């Protein structure tokens, strides 16, 4: 019975991963507004994430990033790579586990100066999982990102 359950679990995970081929951060932004409309620069400030304003917007590809002020927009434009979310905005912890999930944009961590976003669903807190083994989760997420997203 245990072998059957393990095989079934593996098959379900494999199907989920296969269905995510050619994934893009667009799937977490069906309306084209990235990061749930939150200001990327504000994640790095004491205030924490602030809602962006359409008056301070910047487009990258098909995604529009909103900022809460002209100053934050200019800060972003001066160093975009610093402020763009790691793993194109997918949940870092679930990516480490081999699947893609859209995060809860209020569940985040700044690690080594980079924004990590995490799922928060029911009893699953991606940030807590990540914090239990940040080095291991980072290694697995980096490896999975190469195959699942890029």
What are the residue ranges of the model-derived segments?
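Compositionally biased, low-structure terminal segments
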Residues: 10-11, 77, 84, 146
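Mature extracytoplasmic domains of secretory-pathway proteins
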Residues: 66-68, 72-85
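N-terminal signal peptide c-region/cleavage motif recognized by signal peptidases
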Residues: 14-18
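Intrinsically disordered, low-complexity terminal tails and linkers in eukaryotic proteins, enriched
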Residues: 20-61, 82-150
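Sec-dependent N-terminal signal peptides
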Residues: 4-13
């Amino acid at each position: 019975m245990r072998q059957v359950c393990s095989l079934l679990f593996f098959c379900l995970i494999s199907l989920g991963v296969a269905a995510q081929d050619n994934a893009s951060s667009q799937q977490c932004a069906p309306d084209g507004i990235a990061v749930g409309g939150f200001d990327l620069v504000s994640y790095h400030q004491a205030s924490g994430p602030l809602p962006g304003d359409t008056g301070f917007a910047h487009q990258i590809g098909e995604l529009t990033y909103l900022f809460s002020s002209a100053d934050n927009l200019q800060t972003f434009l001066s160093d975009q790579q610093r402020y763009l979310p790691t793993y194109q905005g997918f949940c870092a912890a679930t990516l480490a586990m081999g699947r893609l999930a859209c995060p809860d944009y209020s569940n985040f961590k700044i690690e080594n100066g980079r924004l990590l976003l995490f799922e928060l669903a029911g009893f699953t807190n991606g940030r807590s999982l990540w914090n239990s083994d940040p080095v291991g989760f980072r290694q697995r997420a980096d490896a999975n990102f190469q195959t699942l997203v890029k």
